[in-house]
């Protein structure tokens, strides 16, 4: 779908760009431990590798995991604005900081190579 959107000049607005907080690294929160949707949707075998690489880049850059994940997403062709679900002020701070964070080609490749597309899930199947 994304290549078609790019070819037709249609902007992409990714929903839940941090995978319900998974990419922000918040696995130890009450929400993460009780979120049945996240457990159902974000259990692909490639997910741990993606999380590890996001965390590694964030540590090396001195930024949050959320900033790295959002920066990667915003550097993808066709993406015009991720739809974040901010519930705390620092979520907005991370999203704003991600706009100015430019990942280099090696970092982009490390993240892209680890990711495997997930099957379509949810009520639109």
Residues covered by each model-derived region:
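Beta-sheet entry/capping signal
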Residues: 11, 80-82
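Short glycine/serine/threonine-biased micro-segments
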Residues: 19, 23, 83, 120
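Aromatic-lined glycan-binding groove of carbohydrate-active enzymes
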Residues: 1-32, 64
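Short, basic-rich loop-to-helix N-cap that marks the start of a DNA-contacting helix
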Residues: 86
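Short, flexible segments with low predicted structural confidence
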Residues: 26, 40, 63-65, 82
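Glycine/threonine-rich phosphate-binding loop and adjacent beta-strand/alpha-helix elements that clamp
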Residues: 68
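Terminal-tail/helix-coil boundary detector
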Residues: 7, 31-60, 75-79, 89-125
